[in-house]
Structure formats: C-alpha cells, structure tokens
Amino acid sequence: MSNLSIFKIGVGPSSSHTLGPMLAGNLFCKKVAKKLDEIDRVEVTLYGSLSLTGKGHLSDKAVIWGLNGLEAKNLSTAIQDEVNKNAIENAQIDFCGEKKLCFNYEKDLIFSKDFLPLHENGMKIKAYDCKGGLVDEETYYSVGGGFVLTAAQLEKKGKNSNQNKKKKLDIELNNAKEALELCDKRDWDLAELSYRYELQFHTKEEIRAYCLEIWEVMQEVYYNGTHPNEDYLPGKLHLKRRAKGLKERVAMTADPMGIIDFISLYAIAIAEENASGAKVVTAPTNGACAVIPAVMLYLKNHTIGFSDERAIEFLLTAMLIGSFYKKNASISGAEAGCQAEIGSASSMAAAAMATVLGANAFKACNAAEMAMEHHLGLTCDPVAGLVQIPCIERNAFGAIKAISAARMAMTRKSTPMVSLDEVIETMYETGKDMNYKYKETSLGGLATNLKTVC
C-alpha cells in the first residue's frame, strides 16, 4: 500500500475524532447506496474515546458531515455551519447528498461511555425503514490518522487490514530493519528508498504533484494561522490565539535564541488553525499536524537550499518513517497516548530533516529513534476534550525535539544502543499499558486537574 495517505488534506481538530467519523459516514453512504429508497432514519452511536471527547473534537458534527455525503478535503467552515444548523436546528440531514431524512440530534446521535472490544475509537451506524425495521448497520473503528476500518477488517487483519497486497512488490517495507538493509545494499538514503517504493503505486509526476500540494497547503495553513479572523479559539476554554502576536514579536527580536521562538511560532500558528476546525494537513494526525511543517518552515526560512525538491525528499522520508509506526504500533492518541501522535510526528520530522541535510539511512533512523525515545510515556489528556491544552504547545516542543534529534544524530560518532524498531515496539507496549484515563478520554491528568475548567 502506498504511504502517501500518511499526509491528507482535511479539517481540524482531530484526525481520529473528526476525519475518522466523517469518513465512516462516507463509507456508510457507499454501503447503503442501493438501499436509499428503503431508509427512513439513521442512528449513530459513538463509543469510548469518540464519545468521551467527541463534542470537543467535533466527532458528532463530523459524522453528520459524512452522512451528508461531504468529504473533508473540500469542506469549508461555511458548509460546516450550514450542515450543522440544518441537522441541529432543522432536524434534517441530506443523507448521502441525495435523500432528505429527519434527524433528531438528541436521539439519533448517541454518546455511550462503553468501549467496543477492538479499539478505543468505536462507532456504530444503523439505518432503519419507516416501520422501524433494520435496513443495514456497520461498526467502524477510527484507528488514527484519519484511517477507518470496519469491525470485520480489524478482526481479520488487525492494524494492517487495509493493506491488502494485490501483487508481489519488488520493494516491501515493513520495518526500519528492512529499510536499512535495502539502503545499505543499494546505496540509497531514506528519501530515495521511499521514492522507489512509491513508484510501485504512482507515477513520478503523481508523487511530485502530491507532495508539492501537501507542502503548499502546509504553508497556507501557517499563513492563515498568523492572520486569523478570530482572536479566540472555539470552545469553553476561551483560549486566546497567540500566533499573530508572536509573529510580530519575533520579527523584531535580536535575541540569539530567537530561532526557538520562530520554530514555536510556526508550530503554534498551524496548531491553532487545527484547533479552530480549519483546513490542515494530517501529519500523521491532526493533533500533531504542526510538528512536521514547523520543521520544514525552519529549514526553508533559516537554512540555505531548502527547495521544492528538498521538500519532496523531506515528505517522502517522513511518510516512510510514519508507515513503520502505523504498521507496527499506533498513531492514535486514544490507543497509545500522545507519544503515538506528537512522538511519531517528531520522529518522522527528525529523520526527514537529517536526510535532507545529507544523512545516510542509518543516521536518519537514529534521529527518528532519539525523537521518539524522548516522547515515551507522553499522555493524551486534552482539557475539556479540546485539541488546545496541552496540544498546541506540544506541537512546538515536538518540532524542537525533532531538530535537536536530527542534529545529534548527524554529529554522533558512537554507535547507538537502541534501534528505531525497538523504540517503536516500546512505544506501543507503553501505550497499551497506559491507563485509559490518559488516552484521549479527558478523564485524567490536566483534563481533570485544571481547576479553572473543572
């Protein structure tokens, strides 16, 4: 399976809790496309983390967007508002974009605190006829990064169920060990390896165009974050946006440590856009969407030679590293804590930065390992169920750690003790051992100890 989908253009604030439920709604529409005449009502039940932090993450709204047949890439805030109003105030949805149905937001959208057995982010969608008979149903799991699997897919093949191999590939990459062996054999860096891998699924023109579109949108999101229409982020925290003021201050500073402020600016601006529900790039999740572009903006604005070609190499490297986390661990905060989101993004960015600065595959993987090693155990405890505190600032720290890890790996003379595959395995084990209160449920940590909210 191609790794390009590690980066997706969508809307905030969460890939697993916003994009995932929206995609589930889209998938259900496709499932019942030939039964529309029979359907009179739909009912959605959100479970586990989707329920516990669903309203703050807009999960309830997102599934409604999906059931209206809307897709994330082209979803504007104006369309969001129109569909929300129609569903909540007018009690109606345009099911699959083709049939108007009555929809009672209070009764047809159910928040259950129960957890479904296969994953922390579960949901069920049911369709009924005019007599109350069940027409169709499906159970979906939002497994992180905007990826969604049905219960049958998850039971059959676990996290790799969406990676059916239709043909024998010349290059198969399941972990960092295999990648390093191939790079050593062919004298490739990680960017070249990732490019050769993607050529098995796409033309060189398609790969280039996709990466440049992702990079263009990342820069657009940063600009929007420094030119906001509102001074405060949505939600009951009434959190003031900081990026605009931070940009004005760092532009005037002569502080030799000012580079840290620039990196923070890039990350905060993008993370604030995500928190507002605006367009962002999932990288590899929405909660961690600012880490990778912040490092790229640092390279573009503060180093020499970061061209479009280097940006493509950066993204190719990052998506390769991200695929190892997705295949062998998790990129879901609800499954493995924030280490799976910010940690994975920082690891991806570290390897990518090292690669575009000339590191071989071994040093790039060492950079990725160090970045994750120092995110191990990081909890996901969003205050008020919003992707704001501590999420926005964590993106800045993830970017700074990535840059530090890349530089440390490139100047290192000794042989690393820990491999990338070992730290990926450790992250996943740590996440599965972590108490559910600290995995995107807002039932522990800062989410309960911040007294001004609780």
PLM region spans:
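C-terminal regulatory domains involved in ligand/effector binding and gene-expression control
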Residues: 69-252
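Alpha-helical support elements that line or immediately flank enzyme active sites
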Residues: 16-33, 293-305, 350-358
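Hydrophobic alpha-helical bundle architecture
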Residues: 306, 317, 323-396, 408-417
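Short, mixed-charge aromatic SLiMs
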Residues: 41-54, 85-93, 316-327, 369-382, ...
